[in-house]
């Protein structure tokens, strides 16, 4: 399997090179040149690590299959408390794929607990011995998951950039208290798009690469612009489907819809890849919060980032520049020239419009909708009162949207974070007065609902804060060169 840039068909690399580089030299994203076909009958009874090995092996063909099996087992057997790919019935026809039972209580753990192993092996496959410096822009969850995955690894350094005042207090403390001599964390005076754009500029700056090369350092990324982030996320779509069949909730071969709360389009794109591999997926439903640039795009074909940026109670979706959409545009248009043109328009004018054929192909696979904070809070309350099901603010957005677009097909909502990562907002949604402290809110939410508090979150206020530096977006380059 080879990978090419979304912007230049002549940029061809192996999977190891795609994972090590992260971003293509022309600014494009690496995509597979073909989709392996899933062996659904053979895969349906596999454990989560076994299924992960099969999916990974189809794309990462320059990795030894035995290594992939060992890496998957080391990642998913213990760290997810026996709940990797856990599917919970909410009510008839509606299910929640709970992706927050990993060590940092967010879906990013599925990729970022495995990806460090893939990166280290990629360096071995390619005979690379220099230090790898990983730059991460995060709206909250990716930062902690990446820090937890890469902390302490020899030959690896990681720098995380998050929007100051743009995360929950729990998310901030998860990053600010991270242990490890090879980790650095910076708050950026701006929003997520400022952080992400700053990091992308560093990757595209030849002078940065040249200076770091003199010091035997190369850059890589742990954001979902890196193929190594996406491929592990394909697995849980298959696993969820097989569990629904096993439970008798879905007939074999029956299409299932998936509703995904997303801002950067990576998690839902993994579902598109699963569909291309042969999984019976009906619609992939893109759920946005008030920053609804993706909803507008899927409806109209015009991507217009020239709009007000809103801080919401679902901060991991507070994004206006959705990086992974570029991959979908390449797959549905089949034209790197078109993609390069659209991305150039976005960089120059803040918007672009795709052709009618491209839009029709997107709408054939994707539906969409959006929900603001008020609707999300009402949904948290409704799901708890009606179904005794507690969800976080991002998952609530997806439940809202799922209800507006549901067909007769079973609907799986991807639950992307523990409700205890946003305890004040969840508690307020349940009609309680939220304390000022997230930790007091955790305790109150536990009393109110009886749902256990994840141990990794409950101890955060006892850990020393190591990182409290705030920088301007323009200083991201200097931080990358430190």
Segments predicted by a language model, with ranges:
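PLP-dependent amino-acid enzyme catalytic core
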Residues: 1-482
């Amino acid at each position: 399997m080879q990978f090419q840039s979304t912007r230049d068909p002549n940029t061809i690399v192996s999977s190891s090179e795609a994972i090590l580089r992260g971003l293509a030299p022309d600014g494009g994203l690496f995509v597979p040149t073909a989709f392996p076909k899933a062996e659904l009958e053979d895969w349906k009874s596999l454990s989560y690590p076994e299924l992960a090995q099969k999916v990974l092996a189809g794309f990462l063909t320059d990795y030894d299959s035995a290594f992939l099996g060992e890496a998957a087992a080391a990642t998913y057997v213990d760290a997810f408390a026996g709940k990797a790919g856990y599917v919970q019935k909410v009510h008839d026809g509606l299910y929640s794929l709970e992706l927050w039972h990993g060590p940092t209580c967010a879906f990013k753990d599925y990729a970022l607990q495995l990806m460090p192993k893939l990166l280290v092996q990629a360096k071995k496959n390619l005979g690379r011995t220099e230090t790898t410096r990983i730059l991460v822009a995060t709206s909250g969850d990716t930062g902690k998951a990446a820090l937890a995955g890469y902390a302490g690894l020899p030959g690896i350094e990681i720098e995380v950039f998050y929007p100051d005042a743009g995360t929950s207090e729990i998310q901030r403390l998860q990053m600010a208290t991270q242990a490890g001599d090879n980790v650095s964390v910076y708050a950026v005076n701006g929003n997520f798009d400022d952080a992400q754009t700053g990091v992308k500029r560093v990757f595209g700056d030849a002078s940065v690469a040249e200076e770091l090369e003199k010091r035997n350092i190369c850059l890589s990324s742990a954001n979902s612009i890196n193929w190594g982030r996406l491929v592990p996320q394909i697995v849980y779509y298959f696993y969820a489907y097989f569990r629904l069949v096993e439970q008798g909730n879905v007939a074999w071969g029956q299409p299932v819809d998936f509703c995904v709360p997303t801002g950067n389009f990576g998690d839902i794109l993994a579902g598109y890849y699963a569909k291309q591999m042969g999984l019976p997926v009906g619609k992939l439903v893109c759920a946005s919060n008030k920053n609804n640039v993706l909803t507008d795009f899927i409806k109209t074909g015009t991507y217009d980032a020239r709009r007000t940026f809103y801080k919401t109670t679902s901060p991991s979706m507070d994004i206006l520049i959705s990086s992974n959409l570029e991959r979908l545009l390449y797959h549905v248009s089949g034209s790197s020239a078109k993609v390069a043109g659209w991305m150039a328009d976005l960089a120059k004018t803040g918007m672009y419009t795709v052709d009618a054929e491209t839009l029709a192909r997107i709408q054939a696979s994707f539906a969409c909708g959006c929900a603001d904070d008020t609707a999300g809070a009402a949904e948290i309350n409704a799901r708890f009162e009606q179904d005794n099901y507690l969800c976080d603010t991002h998952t609530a957005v997806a439940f809202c949207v799922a209800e507006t677009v549901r067909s007769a097909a079973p609907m799986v909502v991807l639950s992307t974070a523990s409700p205890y990562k946003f305890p004040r907002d969840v508690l307020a949604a349940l009609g309680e007065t939220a304390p000022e402290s997230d930790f007091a809110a955790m305790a109150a939410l536990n009393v109110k609902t009886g749902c256990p508090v994840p141990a990794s979150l409950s101890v955060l206020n006892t850990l020393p804060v190591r990182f409290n530096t705030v920088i301007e977006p323009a200083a991201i380059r200097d931080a990358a060169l430190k």
